[in-house]
Amino acid sequence: SALFLAMHYTPDTLTAFSSVAHICRDVNYGWLIRYMHANGSSLFFICLYLHIGRGIYYGSYSYTETWNIGIILLFLTMA
């Protein structure tokens, strides 16, 4: 969904809002793609945080190399 949104989005500060309005109004099912992207990314990050919480609960932080690689992957995901 991000690829379809990126084809119509303009990151310029003057035209960003109008490009989002263009996606919602003029692109076929653009509103659906936008909402599916927002909900899908929210679900992805909820699952990511649950996975981290599971690792904390089961004491996986004692494996420092594995834990540090996971933290690096978390930061790369958010970047």
Curated annotation (Swiss-Prot):
Locations listed in the record: Mitochondrion inner membrane
Alphabetically ordered keywords of this record: Electron transport, Heme, Iron, Membrane, Metal-binding, Mitochondrion, Mitochondrion inner membrane, Respiratory chain, Transmembrane, Transmembrane helix, Transport, Ubiquinone
Cofactor(s) required for function per UniProt: heme b
Pfam family, one: Cytochrome_B
Binding-site list for heme b b566: H51
Membrane topology: Multi-pass membrane protein
One BP term from GO: mitochondrial electron transport, ubiquinol to cytochrome c
SUPFAM superfamilies xref list: Transmembrane di-heme cytochromes
Membrane-spanning intervals of the chain: 1-7, 31-52, 67-79
Subunit and partners: The cytochrome bc1 complex contains 11 subunits: 3 respiratory subunits (MT-CYB, CYC1 and UQCRFS1), 2 core proteins (UQCRC1 and UQCRC2) and 6 low-molecular weight proteins (UQCRH/QCR6, UQCRB/QCR7, UQCRQ/QCR8, UQCR10/QCR9, UQCR11/QCR10 and a cleavage product of UQCRFS1). This cytochrome bc1 complex then forms a dimer.
Name the record gives this protein: Cytochrome b
Organism listed in the record: Dipodomys californicus (California kangaroo rat)
Lineage summary: Eukaryota, Metazoa, Chordata, Craniata, Vertebrata
